Amino acid sequence: MVRVSGSGKELKRICWLIVAGLLSACTPAPEFTDAAGQTVTLDHFAGKPLLVNYFAPWCAPCLREMPHLNALATEGEIAVVAINYDPTTPAELDKLAAQYHIKVPLLIANEDARLPFPRPSGLPTSYLLDSEGKLKQTLVGELGQSQIDALKASIRHPGN
């Protein structure tokens, strides 16, 4: 018999932490549905920072910030997706994009998706993920140009 220092409870806790870490590493990426009805995961946007924006067509601040999000996505430094907060269909996403001139990919979150961020309690809410998919910032409220500029600076100079 080999004696190991530390209590049995402590070793058991360490083993459970290891198992939990392994299980979370094996959790599939959350799935979304795009306007074409295709399945999309956040892994599709890996390799560059990603701004995930929750919006709704009835939310005036959400619609006011869309031109800023369109411009940010066009610049290409940060990928941008917008998730409709309300249940909807791919056809309705297409209508929204046309009606409000939304150029960023519009997605529907599957209800059972395990997201790397909480479902927002208010709109608009945006989540900035780094190039590895880790949550870096949560931004609640309408994004104006000054917030967009700060986001870009935080990506260029992490830790500042």
Q: Predicted segment positions?
A:
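Sec-dependent bacterial lipoprotein signal peptides
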Residues: 1-26
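N-terminal "domain-start" segment that seeds a small globular fold
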Residues: 21-43
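Short active-site neighborhood of thiol/selenol oxidoreductases, capturing the structured segment around
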Residues: 42-63
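Conserved helix-turn-beta segment immediately C-terminal to the redox Cys motif
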Residues: 48-50, 64-86, 98-99, 150, ...
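Short alpha-helical
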Residues: 60, 87-91, 143-146
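Thiol-based oxidoreductase modules, predominantly thioredoxin-like and allied folds used
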Residues: 78-90, 102-111
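Short, internal strand/loop/helix patches
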Residues: 98-131
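Thiol-/selenol-based redox modules, centered on thioredoxin-like
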Residues: 125-160
